[in-house]
Amino acid sequence: MLRKGTAQTRALLHILTRGDILAIVRTDVPMTSALCEETILKLVDTYPFLRTEVLTTTAFGRPVRTLTIGEGDRKVIYSAAHHANEWITTPLILKFIEELAEAVQNQGRLYGVKARNIVRAATIYTVPMVDPDGVDLVTGAIETGTLQYAAAQRLSDNYPQIPFPEGWKANLLGVDLNLQYPAGWLRAREIKFSQGYTRPGPRDYVGRAPLNQRESIALADFTQEIDPALVLAYHTQGKVIYWQLQDYAVPGARALGEEFARLSGYELADTPYESSFAGYKDWFIQKFRRPGYTIEAGSGQNPLPIEQFPEIYRDNLGILVTAALGLPR
């Protein structure tokens, strides 16, 4: 029998008061593709109004999944973990969906907004882990001594200045997925080749052609199918929001970006020239002429420690809610 004040009692009370022990989304351990898959399926089972589908599987068989909530006319897409060592953005998206779903089920609020109003107004499509192969390498789910680890290490040996595996951003074929989109891809190739990234490796290799990787093809196809009003592409780090495509500014994008900056405390900034080509946000703005944002969450050196998650979530919750609703007219 538990006595008042014991550790067991405190743990039980924590469960009964819906603390972190009851949460489906783990925010205390590194994210892996298997944990992401398990989490999404548990969320869909717990909240039947959530939907999921597999967009593709990677060259090594890992699924790239969506997780969707809402039935509103305004469609938005939030993506995360385009880069392997930026995996902390995956639980950011998953936790947001979990808290929104719980608030919908309990007729509650999220960030001061009635949750049911959010899902009536918007349909929020998310791709929580664009690069599951790379994430598994960085987080240790691909163990030393395995064929996949050895193959990645051989590619990494071409770039000895990049720490392995923590410096890995690419997929396991050594292609940087956020340099795969047809928005100045040839210019991106020129820039990255001039920097020495001429062959597959841990980061910054653009591939042999735009959209020639399963993951980037799947996200581009999905985006064209959904035809969203807005996209958020989550990366780390720097506490910066990038909002335009070179000199082109989508009407209304700055005002919404300024609101994101106000809510998060992040800086709204122009994308540095050498990083202005072939990214997902760049392609979306070029093709759709609608607001797209790359958000560099958190601060420090990638991969960011999981201990930084509470701050990242707190800073970005307002962005995630506001992007779904847009600015008041």
Annotate each predicted stretch with a short phrase:
Residues 75-77, 293:
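Conserved beta-strand elements of the Class I
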Residues 83:
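Conserved phosphate/anionic-ligand binding catalytic regions in large, soluble enzymes, centered on
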Residues 73, 88, 95-97, 101-242, ...:
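Active-site/substrate-binding loop(s) of hydrolase catalytic cores
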Residues 52-56, 106-115, 268-273:
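Surface-exposed patches in mature extracellular/periplasmic domains of secreted proteins
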Residues 66-73:
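Short beta-strand-to-loop junctions in surface cap/lid or active-site-entrance loops
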Residues 54, 184-329:
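Metallocarboxypeptidase
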Residues 15-60:
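Short glycine- and acidic-rich boundary segments immediately preceding or forming the N-terminal edge
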